[in-house]
Amino acid sequence: MEEDLKLQPDSETLTTPNSEVGAVELVKHEEENEQVEQDPGYVTPPEDGKEPVAALSEPNYLGGEDDVLLKHIARQSTIVREALKECTQTPLTVEELSRAYEANLFSPRVPPKKQPNGTCETNPRLNFYPVFAVPEALATYHIFFKNQRIPLSCRANRTRGDGLLHLKAGAHIPEIVSLEEVPKIFEGLGKDEKRAANALQKNETENQNVLVELEGDNARLAVLKRTIEVSHFAYPALNLPPKVMRSVMDQVLIKRAEPIDPQQPDLNSEDGQPVVSDDELARWLGTQDPSELQERRKMMMAAVLVTVELECLQRFFANPQTLRKVEESLHYAFRHGYVRQACKISNVELSNLISYMGILHENRLGQNVLHCTLQGEARRDYVRDCIYLFLILTWQTAMGVWQQCLEEQNLQELNKLLVRARRELWTSFDERTVARQLANLIFPERLMQTLQNGLPDFVSQSILQNFRSFVLERSGILPAMSCALPSDFVPLCYRECPPPLWSHCYLLRLANYLAHHSDLMEDSSGDGLLECHCRCNLCTPHRSLVCNTELLSETQVIGTFEIQGPEQQEGASSLKLTPALWTSAYLRKFIPEDYHAHQIKFYEDQSRPPKVPLTACVITQSQILAQLQAIQQARQEFLLKKGHGVYLDPQTGEELNTPSLSAAASCRSQKHATQGKQASHRATAIPAETTKAVGRGGDVGRQPGRGSFRRGGGGADGELGQPRRGGPRGRGGRNHRQRQGTIFQKTRSEPTSENYPAPATATMFTESQP
C-alpha cells in the first residue's frame, strides 16, 4: 500500500517539468483512504535553473543525459533557422514561413553536390518535408490551368478513336493549322456515334454531363461514364510566358486597362484602345472598306492568341534533335528497347535515373514497367496519355524557365522590336505568315536552342502518374474512383476542337506519333535475341543484336580478354572490354543518317540496306573482333577436348574445365558398355578381383595417372574420385583434393587413349572461362 502512495516518476518523453507552477500532486486522504488532487500553489524553482530529472521507472535505452528524441527537434530547428537567414523580416504568418522553408529546401542558392556517378547526393533536410506533398516552390508554372467546358467531340465520345489514331508505316509527323484553314468547328457527337439504350433516359434529366454512354465504348470508358459526371476540365496551361504575351498585347493588339488614377486621369485615356487605329490600318492596307479592316483585326487576334502558340510548339518539338532526345527519354521511362538491353548486360537499372532542370537524380522508388500489365487498347491509351503528359510537362518546364529569366530590360528590348515590326505584322499575307514572323521575334533561335539543350528530362511512369493525379484532382475528378485519363477530354482533330484547345490537340496527335515512332504501342520483343527487340530507328538496326551481327559478336567477348601494351613503355594503357565500358559506348551509339525523325520508317519495312554500315560499339574493326572471337572459341575447345586435370582461373580460382554431371553420366555408361563387351566370353559368375582387373585393363589402364579419362585413374567399378593403385600419388595431400573435384572432359566420340600432355601455359590465361 505504501508503494501506491508514492509519487510516480515522470516519463522521460514528457515536456512538462516537475517544478512547474501549478503542478498537481497526489496525496492520501486519511479518512476515506482514496487519492484526491490538490494544488500545492507556487513552487520555488531550483537556484541553478536546472530541473531535476526523475529516474526512469524501468530501463530505457533512449534516456541518459541527452534525450535522443530531442535530436529530431534540434535538426528541424536548424533547418528552419537556415531558412530564416535570408529573410529581412521574421515571418509572421504560416504562409510566409512555408514559402521561406520551401525556397531553402528546393531552391537553394548553392546547387547540390554531384556524386562520381553523376547523380546528386541525398539531401537529409528533405526528411522533414511532407512525403507526398507537391512543393509550391517547384510547381511554378505547373499550377496554372485553363478551365474550360469539355467539347462533346472529345476522345471519350469517339468509339473509333483508337482506330483513327492508328498510324501505319510511312505516316508523317502531325502539322499545325490556322483559323483561316479551319474556319468551322464541329463539337457534336457525329452521325457515326450511337447512344446506348440506357443512356437515352438518363440524359433527359441530366444535361450537365458531357460524357455520353455510347454503344461502342470500350470497357474502361463505359465504366468511366457510369462513375463520374463532368462538364468542365482543368486543361494544363500551355500559354507562352505571361510577361511575353503582355508585351505582345500592349504593342500589337490592344493596350491594357490600368486602374484609373484620380489625380492624373489623362494618363489612362488610351487604355483599352486598339494599338493600330482604323485610319492608320486603312492607310497601311490601302483600303477604306470596314469589312476588310474588321477581317484583318480578326486575323491578328487569332494569330496572337492561337497560331503563334502552335508555331512555337511545333518549332520546339519538331526539331530532329529534340525528337531524338524525347524518344530516348521515353525509352528510359518505359524501360524499352536499347535501354532494356543495356540494363541487362550492365546489370545496372538505368531506368532509375530521373532529372529536372539539368540536375540528375537516382530514384529507385519509381516504376517503369507498369505498361506491361496492360494489353490491347488499354495499353495504347495508357502509353499515349503518358507521352501526352510528358510533352506537357516538358513544355511547361521550358515556359517556367523562360518566364523566370526575363528581366525588365529584356521586356523593354522586346517592346522596341515589336514596335519596329508592327506595320510588317499587320500587313502580312495571311495568318500563318503573321505567326511565323511573330515567333521569330518572341521565340528566337538562340532561346529555342538553349531550352532544347536542357530538355527534355528523364522521367519515370510514377512521375507521370503523380502529374496525372494532380491534373485530375484540379478538375474535380477523384483518380482512385475513376479510370479517367487527361487525354480522354481532348478532341482528336482540329475541326472538332475549339481553337483555345488546339495546342492540346496538337500535343495529343504528336504523342500518338511518338508512340508509334518509338514502337511503344505493341510489344515487339520475344525470346532469345528478341528479348529486348524494338523496331524504332533508335534501336534497329545499329543497336539491335538481331540485325547487327558484329554487335552481337562484341557482346560475346565482353570480359574475356585484356590487351596490354609493351611494359617497357611508360604510360602504356591496356584495353579490357568491361560491361560498363561497353554500355557507355552502346548508349552513345547513334547514327543520324538512319534516323527518320519526321516519318515512321522502320528498318524491317525497307528494302534497301542502311546508309551506314553496321559496326560494333567499341571494337569497330571486324577483323580484330573476329580474331578475338576465334581465340576465345579455340581456348574453349582446347579446354573441353584436350585439357586434363584441373585448370584454375588465376583471378577467381574457379575450375575452368569442370563439365556438367550429364557428361560424367555419359562417360560412365560408355565405360560400363566397354566392360560388358570384354567380359562377354567369360562365365557368368566372375570374382570381384577379376572384375576390378578388367575395369583397369587396356592400354589406358596401364598408363600411370591416365586411367579412365582422368588423372589418378578409375575406381573398381567405374566410380569417380578413387585413385588407381598404379598412380604416381596416394590419397592424401593437396593434389588429392584437387583430383576429387575433377570430372570428365571427353565425349563419346573421343578415343580412350591420348598422350597429349597438359598445357604448361594454361595457368597464364587471364580470360574468364565458362
Swiss-Prot record:
Protein induction: Expressed in the late phase of the viral replicative cycle.
Q: Name one GO molecular function term.
A: RNA binding
Q: Where is the composition biased (Polar residues)?
A: 10-19, 742-755
Query: Can you cite an annotated GO cellular component?
Result: host cell cytoplasm
Using the UniProt annotation, give all residue ranges assigned to the region (Disordered).
1-20, 30-49, 661-770
One GO BP annotation of this record: intracellular transport of viral protein in host cell
Compartments in which it is found: Host cytoplasm
User: Spans of biased composition, class Basic residues?
Assistant: 726-739
One Pfam family name is Adeno_100
Modified-residue entries (Phosphotyrosine), positions: 332, 647
Stretch list, region Binding to host EIF4G: 248-312
Q: Report the domain of life of the source organism.
A: Viruses
Q: Which UniProt keywords apply?
A: Chaperone, Eukaryotic host gene expression shutoff by virus, Eukaryotic host translation shutoff by virus, Host cytoplasm, Host gene expression shutoff by virus, Host-virus interaction, Inhibition of eukaryotic host translation factors by virus, Late protein, Methylation, Phosphoprotein, RNA-binding, Translational shunt, Transport
Q: What is its main location?
A: host cell
- For the RRM domain, which residue ranges apply? 315-433
Matches recorded under InterPro entries:
L4
Modifications after synthesis and translation: Might be cleaved by the viral protease.
Family of the protein in this entry? Belongs to the adenoviridae shutoff protein family.
> Could you tell me which HAMAP family the record lists for this protein?
ADV_SHUT
Question: What does the subunit section of this Swiss-Prot or TrEMBL entry state?
Answer: Monomer. Interacts with hexon protein; this interaction allows chaperoning and trimerization of hexon proteins. Interacts (via N-terminus) with host initiation factor EIF4G (via C-terminus). Interacts (via RRM domain) with viral mRNAs that contain the tripartite leader; this interaction allows ribosome shunting and expression of viral late mRNAs.
**Role, per record:** Protein that inhibits host translation while promoting late viral translation by ribosome shunting. Blocks host cap-dependent translation by binding to eIF4G, displacing MKNK1 from cap initiation complexes and preventing EIF4E phosphorylation. Binds to the tripartite leader sequence of viral late mRNAs and recruits host eIF4G, PABPC1/poly-A binding protein and 40S ribosomes subunits on viral mRNAs, allowing ribosome shunting and efficient translation of late viral mRNAs even though conventional translation via ribosome scanning from the cap has been shut off in the host cell.
What else is noted?
A: All late proteins expressed from the major late promoter are produced by alternative splicing and alternative polyadenylation of the same gene giving rise to non-overlapping ORFs. A leader sequence is present in the N-terminus of all these mRNAs and is recognized by the viral shutoff protein to provide expression although conventional translation via ribosome scanning from the cap has been shut off in the host cell.
What is the name of this protein?
Shutoff protein
Q: Which organism is it from?
A: Human adenovirus F serotype 40
